Amino acid sequence: MSTARTENPVIMGLSSQNGQLRGPVKPTGGPGGGGTQTQQQMNQLKNTNTINNGTQQQAQSMTTTIKPGDDWKKTLKLPPKDLRIKTSDVTSTKGNEFEDYCLKRELLMGIFEMGWEKPSPIQEESIPIALSGRDILARAKNGTGKSGAYLIPLLERLDLKKDNIQAMVIVPTRELALQVSQICIQVSKHMGGAKVMATTGGTNLRGDIMRLDDTVHVVIATPGRILDLIKKGVAKVDHVQMIVLDEADKLLSQDFVQIMEDIILTLPKNRQILLYSATFPLSVQKFMNSHLQKPYEINLMEELTLKGVTQYYAYVTERQKVHCLNTLFSRLQINQSIIFCNSSQRVELLAKKISQLGYSCFYIHAKMRQEHRNRVFHDFRNGLCRNLVCTDLFTRGIDIQAVNVVINFDFPKLAETYLHRIGGSGRFGHLGLAINLITYDDRFNLKSIEEQLGTEIKPIPSNIDKSLYVAEYHSEPVEDEKP
């Protein structure tokens, strides 16, 4: 049997004991900040060119000729309707439609073909303000449609007649950069020439330099790489009209804050800044006071945790953890799961154990080569494996809607880390399960995190109600079509 140390992602045979049955993961698409891609979307990606670090860029601009008066919606290639139940995190809206924002028809076509039917609360609040050119400071939960909240106005404001960089999206991790760029490319595919580029550390700098010789309208980047390209005079940002900081609390932490300050200083003074984050520490407030001009503040965080995520803990010794995990695998109906460890070494050891137990397993951590990380992320996102073991590298904004179970094999020390981890399930208002394996040394952290987040983590019951985390128990019936 192959072990988890294999350089290529290895798909072990799926065990038929439990809910982890043989066969591919069910595709589940949905509106919001992205989702697992439908077959139609995957076919679209197959017909595109791959540039630099694996990001997809349209080989030819797609143009759709719609005559005035045509019912253009009939020409759309819509993904299957998402019939899963959704929580008020995404359904508690004002009832607006995307058409209410006077968006370009070609942009609307991309929005609807992503499966985004109506704006989520964060999109309702953000889109009209961002279109007006005003700075935004938005606090919203992960998994509620933040990517769409800034990408839609960003794309609407592009002038495709110009050949310079007009917008930048800065994100803290390479995986998030690739995810956001793929969403951006898909949404803009009917716009006739919107050029999107992702650039991250760990990839070929020469490839990025060559790509920037051609027209690029939108750059989605990690902080260090884009600053390097700006300083080299390769990325010319003197025409940038909008910059987005996604996961702003991480971007403005001690690791990145000076880089972000340097990036902002290179931009025009009249640029628009959009900040999105689930938490707003003092560093974000300080940055806002220095660089944002009368920002419009959005706060959709009455409570910090996603409403669709049920949280449990199980008291175990360190030696019992693998046995407990095996028991969970045998009893839970897992579509896809993410399992967190606190170190890269423990990730590899646990992935090997899971493979030896006979379960499908990938692993990912920051010490792996970027090429390998990209491949694992892509394959897991597309449902080639049920279980992913990882470090906190994989917590920020990663949107894989097929994930319905998150397991903290190692309990985190910080409430912020816990919040981002469990946000891996219950994406875009769907249901999910978060299970924490708690040792004697973790008991004080458990209590502290409960108090800081104002949430309740319950003892795990002997049987977990599948209606709490299995979408099929709540899927809306498909109405019979009338003859």
From Swiss-Prot:
<dbReference type="GO" id="GO:0003724">
    <property type="term" value="F:RNA helicase activity"/>
</dbReference>
<dbReference type="GO" id="GO:0005737">
    <property type="term" value="C:cytoplasm"/>
</dbReference>
<dbReference type="InterPro" id="IPR000629">
    <property type="entry name" value="RNA-helicase_DEAD-box_CS"/>
</dbReference>
<dbReference type="InterPro" id="IPR001650">
    <property type="entry name" value="Helicase_C-like"/>
</dbReference>
<keyword id="KW-0067">ATP-binding</keyword>
<dbReference type="InterPro" id="IPR027417">
    <property type="entry name" value="P-loop_NTPase"/>
</dbReference>
<keyword id="KW-0694">RNA-binding</keyword>
<keyword id="KW-0347">Helicase</keyword>
<dbReference type="InterPro" id="IPR014001">
    <property type="entry name" value="Helicase_ATP-bd"/>
</dbReference>
<dbReference type="Pfam" id="PF00270">
    <property type="entry name" value="DEAD"/>
</dbReference>
<dbReference type="GO" id="GO:0017148">
    <property type="term" value="P:negative regulation of translation"/>
</dbReference>
<feature type="modified residue" description="Phosphothreonine">
    <location>
        <position position="36"/>
    </location>
</feature>
<dbReference type="Pfam" id="PF00271">
    <property type="entry name" value="Helicase_C"/>
</dbReference>
<keyword id="KW-0547">Nucleotide-binding</keyword>
<dbReference type="InterPro" id="IPR014014">
    <property type="entry name" value="RNA_helicase_DEAD_Q_motif"/>
</dbReference>
<keyword id="KW-0597">Phosphoprotein</keyword>
<comment type="subunit">
    <text>Interacts with LSM14A, LSM14B, EIF4ENIF1/4E-T, PATL1, EDC3 and EDC4. Forms a complex with DCP1A, DCP2, EDC3 and EDC4/HEDLS. Interacts with LIMD1, WTIP and AJUBA. Interacts with APOBEC3G in an RNA-dependent manner. Interacts with RC3H1. Interacts with ATXN2L. Interacts with MCRIP1. Interacts with MCRIP2. Interacts with NUFIP2. Interacts with TRIM71 (via NHL repeats) in an RNA-dependent manner.</text>
</comment>
<feature type="domain" description="Helicase C-terminal">
    <location>
        <begin position="308"/>
        <end position="468"/>
    </location>
</feature>
<feature type="short sequence motif" description="DEAD box">
    <location>
        <begin position="246"/>
        <end position="249"/>
    </location>
</feature>
<comment type="similarity">
    <text>Belongs to the DEAD box helicase family. DDX6/DHH1 subfamily.</text>
</comment>
<dbReference type="InterPro" id="IPR011545">
    <property type="entry name" value="DEAD/DEAH_box_helicase_dom"/>
</dbReference>
<comment type="function">
    <text>Essential for the formation of P-bodies, cytosolic membrane-less ribonucleoprotein granules involved in RNA metabolism through the coordinated storage of mRNAs encoding regulatory functions. Plays a role in P-bodies to coordinate the storage of translationally inactive mRNAs in the cytoplasm and prevent their degradation. In the process of mRNA degradation, plays a role in mRNA decapping. Blocks autophagy in nutrient-rich conditions by repressing the expression of ATG-related genes through degradation of their transcripts.</text>
</comment>
<keyword id="KW-0832">Ubl conjugation</keyword>
<dbReference type="GO" id="GO:0000932">
    <property type="term" value="C:P-body"/>
</dbReference>
<feature type="region of interest" description="Disordered">
    <location>
        <begin position="1"/>
        <end position="40"/>
    </location>
</feature>
<dbReference type="GO" id="GO:0005634">
    <property type="term" value="C:nucleus"/>
</dbReference>
<keyword id="KW-0656">Proto-oncogene</keyword>
<dbReference type="GO" id="GO:0010494">
    <property type="term" value="C:cytoplasmic stress granule"/>
</dbReference>
<dbReference type="GO" id="GO:0005524">
    <property type="term" value="F:ATP binding"/>
</dbReference>
<keyword id="KW-0963">Cytoplasm</keyword>
<dbReference type="GO" id="GO:0036464">
    <property type="term" value="C:cytoplasmic ribonucleoprotein granule"/>
</dbReference>
<feature type="binding site">
    <location>
        <begin position="140"/>
        <end position="147"/>
    </location>
    <ligand>
        <name>ATP</name>
    </ligand>
</feature>
<keyword id="KW-0378">Hydrolase</keyword>
<feature type="short sequence motif" description="Q motif">
    <location>
        <begin position="96"/>
        <end position="124"/>
    </location>
</feature>
<dbReference type="GO" id="GO:0016887">
    <property type="term" value="F:ATP hydrolysis activity"/>
</dbReference>
<feature type="domain" description="Helicase ATP-binding">
    <location>
        <begin position="127"/>
        <end position="298"/>
    </location>
</feature>
<dbReference type="GO" id="GO:0035278">
    <property type="term" value="P:miRNA-mediated gene silencing by inhibition of translation"/>
</dbReference>
<keyword id="KW-0539">Nucleus</keyword>
<protein>
    <recommendedName>
        <fullName>Probable ATP-dependent RNA helicase DDX6</fullName>
        <ecNumber>3.6.4.13</ecNumber>
    </recommendedName>
</protein>
<dbReference type="GO" id="GO:0003723">
    <property type="term" value="F:RNA binding"/>
</dbReference>
<dbReference type="GO" id="GO:0033962">
    <property type="term" value="P:P-body assembly"/>
</dbReference>
